[in-house]
Amino acid sequence: MARSLKKGPFVHYKLEQKVAQNVESGKKAVIKTWSRASMITPDFVGQTIAVHNGKQFVPVYVTENMVGHKLGEFSPTRSFRGHAGAKNKGRK
């Protein structure tokens, strides 16, 4: 279910402050965050945000195509190692 339009997008207030600080100073410092639920706004474009995936911080460079998506979408939490295959498959 989508978020109500009258509420607007959720962005963690500390993350918003850090991005604004980076933009006004002209720095490109990496911003670390645990807020995977924060929506990417146009202010974030051009910034690198390190999003926590439960184990480590995954750097995400924000482009215009990412606006409107959530940060967690670009930092996978599960690593798929493949299904178990049959041993000696095809050998006779």
Curated annotation (Swiss-Prot):
One protein family per Pfam: Ribosomal_S19
UniProt region (Disordered), positions on chain: 73-92
Coiled coil: none
Bias type Basic residues, positions: 80-92
Domain of life: Bacteria
Gene Ontology MF terms: rRNA binding; structural constituent of ribosome
Record's signal peptide: none
InterPro entries xrefs: Ribosomal_uS19, Ribosomal_uS19_bac-type, Ribosomal_uS19_CS, Ribosomal_uS19_SF
Gene3D superfamilies membership: 30s Ribosomal Protein S19, Chain A
Any one biological process term the GO annotation gives: ribosomal small subunit assembly
GO CC annotations on file: cytoplasm; small ribosomal subunit
Keyword field: Ribonucleoprotein, Ribosomal protein, RNA-binding, rRNA-binding
Membership in a protein family: Belongs to the universal ribosomal protein uS19 family.
Reported function: Protein S19 forms a complex with S13 that binds strongly to the 16S ribosomal RNA.
NCBIfam families reported in the protein's UniProt record: rpsS_bact (TIGR01050)
Protein name in the entry: Small ribosomal subunit protein uS19
Organism: Christiangramia forsetii (strain DSM 17595 / CGMCC 1.15422 / KT0803)
